[in-house]
Amino acid sequence: MAYPVVAIVGRPNVGKSTLFNRIAGERISIVEDTPGVTRDRIYSRAEWLGTEFRMIDTGGIDMGDEPFLTQITQQAEIAIDEADVIVFIVSAPEGITDADEKVAKILYRADKPVILAVNKADNPEVRESIYDFYSLGFGDPYPVSGVHGLGLGDLLDAVVKEFPEKDGAPKDDSIRFSLIGRPNVGKSSLVNAMLGEERVIVSNIAGTTRDAIDTKFVADDTKFTMVDTAGIRKRGKVYENTERYSVMRAMRAIDDSDVVLVVLNAEEGIREQDKRVAGYAHEAGRGIIILVNKWDTLKKDNHTLTDFQNLIRIEFQYLSYAPIIFVSAKTGQRLEQLPEMIKRVADNHNKRVQSATLNDVVMDAIALNPTPSDNGKRLRVYYATQVAIAPPTFVVFVNDPKMMHFSYERFLENQIREHFDFEGTPIHLIERARK
C-alpha cells in the first residue's frame, strides 16, 4: 500500500536530521542484522498514534559542490515533488534568516500542506519568540526540540491531520511490482519493453504524490500494477541523478510493491548501490527477482552465465532465495518469462501451509540433523505454526530460544523452503519459549 510521505525541509543547521531521527526513533523496521546490507537514513518508516507514514530528510540528499542557495532550493523542490505533507524547520534562537525566506518562497508554490516547526525551542524564553515566525505565512508555528523531544506530539498531530483521506476504493487485486536499481541499469528501457509487448494497458493511476504514476496492465490473464513508472521514466532535474535521491525513490517504490525486480547492468557488474537498494527490499520483506539487463551486450563463452550467477550469489548472500533472470530490454530476450515469474513469486510471498504438514517437515529435519546441545542441555523443538504471510512467518516453540543457533535456524529455514517452494520470498522464523 502507498503510505503518506512527510518531507523535512529547512536550511542547514536548523536540526533537520536530529528531528528526523527523533521521530523515527526505534520505529525503523529492521528485520535482521544482515551482513552486506547498508541502511540509508534519509528515508524512514515512522508511526504516530497508529498511523504509519514515511519520512524524507531532504538535507541528507547531498548536492555535491552546488552553491548553498541552489542546494536548499533543490531540497525544497524534492519535498514539493515527493511529499504529501511538508515540515518546514526553522531555528528559534536564530530567528528568521534570508535563507528561511528563500525556502518559504519556494514552498508557497507547493500545492501541499506546510507545517512550520520552530526547532531548538528548549526553554520558555525561547518559546515566547516563536510568534515572530507567523510572518513566514504558514499559520501556527509549532515549538519543538529535536534534541529533547519536546513538542513533537503536537507537531505530529498537525502532520497526521493533513494526510490525504483514504478514498474507500475497492481493494486492488492486482500484483504490484517495481523495478529498482541505480541509474543507467536500463530500468526505463525495461519498463517500455515490458509495457510494449502485447500488453493491455488498463490505466495510469496517480499515486499519493503529484508525479507518482502506477501503470496497470494484464498479461497471461493476470492483473499487474507496475509501481512508479513516472519516477523511472522522468528525467531533467539535477537532483534526480544523485545516488541518494535514486535510493530514496527506490525505497518508496519498494514500500508500495508486493514483488521487487532488482535490476543489474551486465556491462558494469555489481556496485555498492545495487547492494543498498536490494538490501532494503530484503529487509522490507518483499518478494524479489534479480534481473541482469543488457545481457545481449556481453561476449560469452560456456562459463559466462554460470560465473555471473555465482558472483551474484556471493555479493547478495542474503538473497539466496531470489531467482535470477538474464534479460535484454533491447532485444526482448527472456522478457516473456517475467509475468509468470512475478506471479509465482507473489503467490509464494502470500503462501500459507498447513500446520500438520509444517510440523512433519520440521520433525523430519530434526531427525536428519539433531538439535544442538549446550552443557548437557539440548534444544527441544515442540511444534511450529505459521503466523503471517507477505512474507511467510513461522513461530517455532522451543524449550529455550537462546539455544537456537543461527546456523541451525538457517538449516530449518532451508528445509521448510525446500519442501514448500518459497522461491523468491524471504521467510522468517521466530523462536518462542513454550509456557
Swiss-Prot record:
Binding annotation for GTP 2: 181-188, 228-232, 293-296
Gene3D superfamilies xrefs: 3.30.300.20, P-loop containing nucleotide triphosphate hydrolases
The EngA-type G domain, residue ranges: 4-167, 175-350
SS bond partners: none
GO process annotations (BP): ribosome biogenesis
Source organism superkingdom: Bacteria
Binding site for GTP 1: 10-17, 57-61, 119-122
Native source organism of the sequence: Levilactobacillus brevis (strain ATCC 367 / BCRC 12310 / CIP 105137 / JCM 1170 / LMG 11437 / NCIMB 947 / NCTC 947) (Lactobacillus brevis)
Function: GTPase that plays an essential role in the late steps of ribosome biogenesis.
Family: Belongs to the TRAFAC class TrmE-Era-EngA-EngB-Septin-like GTPase superfamily. EngA (Der) GTPase family.
GO molecular function: GTP binding; ribosome binding
All residue ranges annotated as the KH-like domain in the record: 351-435
CDD domains: EngA1, EngA2
Pfam families per the UniProt record, alphabetical: KH_dom-like, MMR_HSR1
Protein name per Swiss-Prot or TrEMBL: GTPase Der
PANTHER family: GTPASE DER
Subunit structure: Associates with the 50S ribosomal subunit.
Keywords attached to this entry: GTP-binding, Nucleotide-binding, Repeat, Ribosome biogenesis
